[in-house]
Amino acid sequence: MIQLQKPKLILENGLRTDGRKLDELRPIKIELGVLKNADGSAIFEMGNTKVIAAVYGPKEMHPRHLALPDKASLRVRYHMTPFSTDERKNPAPSRREIELSKVIREALESTILLNLFPRTVIDIFMEVLQADAGTRLVALMAASMALADAGIPMRDLIAGVAVGKADGSLVLDLNEQEDMWGEADMPIAVLPSLGQVVLLQLNGFMTPDEFRRAFELAQKGISSIYALQKEALKNKYLEYKEE
């Protein structure tokens, strides 16, 4: 059996393998209203990770007996396209995709005002077009932006980032190498204006002090992401006004 040797993640000049500083985000691009047949849609890119999200609804639930009397039902599908990774994947939903659909749905339920739309359903589809670490968070943010594009009332947008440990150092917004070879990976998503955490997972090990510093580092990154999200919505609104 071939033993793969762990690559050096932090170079001698103190930078990461992709040239970023330890506390630097990957380039972010957000595009709204990309699908004409959806009620709301968005493409969210973080580095080489790219996700498209589409929202349909609120609409009447079929069959009707499944409708909830006091709020809307939320159906969420997270899916990685067969061409999203180096190795072609089976198009059938994997256990990981089913689990992440559930995790993302629970995070979205904390912000959507579902009680305003009883007996209806909102469908959210997320397709990972390119995967290079952080797909669950990018998918969650793409869904949040698509919901805003659809005009569905929310308590706040969701912004998130992963903080990890690579070669003993805390790093913001992991790339694929750091995700694969790092000692820890902690994705965090929040409702920034409310300071409410809606997703927090830790894979690997951090000391209590590292956890505290990682959380502070994540908050710094989330603040920058939230500003870009609001800017994208503002630009979309200005486009509508000009039309």
From Swiss-Prot:
Keywords tagged on the record: Cytoplasm, Exonuclease, Exosome, Hydrolase, Nuclease
InterPro entries according to UniProt: ExoRNase_PH_dom1, ExoRNase_PH_dom2, ExoRNase_PH_dom2_sf, PNPase/RNase_PH_dom_sf, Ribosomal_Su5_D2-typ_SF, RNase_PH, Rrp41
Domain of life (superkingdom): Archaea
Cellular location(s): Cytoplasm
A GO CC term attached to the entry: cytoplasmic exosome (RNase complex)
Class of enzymatic activity (EC top level): hydrolase
Record flagged with keyword Hydrolase: yes
Main location: cytoplasm
Gene Ontology molecular function, alphabetical: 3'-5'-RNA exonuclease activity; RNA binding
CDD domains hit by this protein: RNase_PH_archRRP41 (cd11366)
UniProt record, GO biological process: gene expression; rRNA catabolic process
Keyword Isomerase: no
EC number: 3.1.13.-
Family the UniProt entry places it in: Belongs to the RNase PH family. Rrp41 subfamily.
Summary of the function given for this chain in its UniProt record: Catalytic component of the exosome, which is a complex involved in RNA degradation. Has 3'->5' exoribonuclease activity. Can also synthesize heteromeric RNA-tails.
Assembly and interaction partners: Component of the archaeal exosome complex. Forms a hexameric ring-like arrangement composed of 3 Rrp41-Rrp42 heterodimers. The hexameric ring associates with a trimer of Rrp4 and/or Csl4 subunits.
NCBIfam families, sorted: ECX1
Name of the protein in its database record: Exosome complex component Rrp41
Originating organism: Sulfolobus acidocaldarius (strain ATCC 33909 / DSM 639 / JCM 8929 / NBRC 15157 / NCIMB 11770)
Gene this protein is translated from: rrp41
